[in-house]
């Protein structure tokens, strides 16, 4: 049976086909604007549900399929006063907790556990009047709950190295365009003799701020660049693709921000097609 990957830390069914380590859609407004020097806490809560697993032609291919995934991720960000190449040096770590329920014909399972931790010790950010830029290299450390005999796994059992570039443009009349670009390079899952292909994906948001509230649209685009490698790989290389779009709202209040977003997936290939809900809380220490 092919894999299902969704939500934080790549919750999986059987093999790795169908998605990447990154939880697509996690970022939106201010995706490229790293905050000023200081220490920050960000909490992500997400719910993903899908009742269709599409083949390479975009048609539902697994009768009776369903996945429901709930993730809560604690992120800690520290930005220093030190500059490298003119940009402020920062770092962050993500610690995800995941519950995933999967159903396929004749089988079902629900499992809770620690997802793979993400670290980046070298984030650089640049700021001007209207433009903000950031770069980094996120490293997905395979410490999450994983057992190849289970239908659902919060962890992935392999490393992912993810170069990141993000930008945010803010106009004089409070119009915003933000985008975060990522490219994933995966190592082999030795327990399954399976290596997921390289992936390109981006999160985006376009919005307008009215007072303390920003409203707009956002989502993500994901496409797999190289073929998977392993004994269960089909002739199309198990290459996945999906696009998602939906409304986003952000509210700022006294050093805190609250973000709500909904994302509807369309045109999925070799992966689930469903919908996501996000709640994001940001505060400075």
Role assignments for model-derived ranges:
Residues 16-20, 48-71, 105-110:
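Surface-exposed strand-loop-strand hairpins of Gram-negative outer-membrane beta-barrel proteins
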Residues 8-14:
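Sec/Tat signal peptide C-region and signal peptidase I cleavage site
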């Amino acid at each position: 049976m092919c894999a299902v990957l969704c939500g934080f830390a790549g919750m999986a069914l059987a093999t790795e086909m169908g998605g990447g380590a990154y939880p697509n859609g996690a970022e939106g407004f201010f995706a490229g604007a790293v905050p000023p020097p200081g220490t920050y806490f960000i909490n992500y809560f997400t719910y993903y549900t899908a009742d269709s697993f599409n083949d390479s032609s975009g048609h539902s291919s697994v009768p009776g399929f369903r996945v429901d995934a709930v993730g809560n991720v604690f992120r800690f960000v520290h930005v220093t006063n030190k500059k490298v190449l003119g940009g402020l040096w920062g770092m962050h770590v993500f610690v995800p907790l995941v519950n995933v329920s999967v159903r396929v014909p004749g089988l079902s399972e629900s499992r809770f556990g620690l997802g793979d931790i993400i670290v980046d010790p070298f984030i650089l950010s640049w700021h001007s009047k209207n433009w903000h830029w950031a770069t980094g290299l996120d490293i997905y450390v395979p410490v999450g709950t994983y057992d190849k005999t289970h239908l659902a796994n919060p962890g992935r059992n392999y490393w992912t190295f993810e170069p990141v570039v993000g930008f945010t443009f803010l106009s004089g009349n409070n119009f915003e365009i933000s985008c975060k670009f990522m490219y994933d390079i995966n190592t082999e899952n030795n327990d399954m003799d399976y290596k997921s292909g390289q992936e390109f994906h981006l999160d985006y948001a376009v919005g307008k701020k009215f007072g303390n509230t920003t409203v707009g649209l956002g989502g993500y685009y994901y496409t797999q660049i190289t073929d998977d490698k392993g004994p269960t790989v089909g002739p199309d290389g198990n290459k996945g693709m999906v696009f998602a779009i939906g409304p986003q709202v952000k509210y700022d209040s006294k050093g805190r921000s609250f973000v709500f977003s909904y994302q509807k997936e369309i045109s999925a290939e070799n992966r689930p097609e469903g919908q996501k809900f996000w709640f994001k809380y940001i505060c400075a220490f």
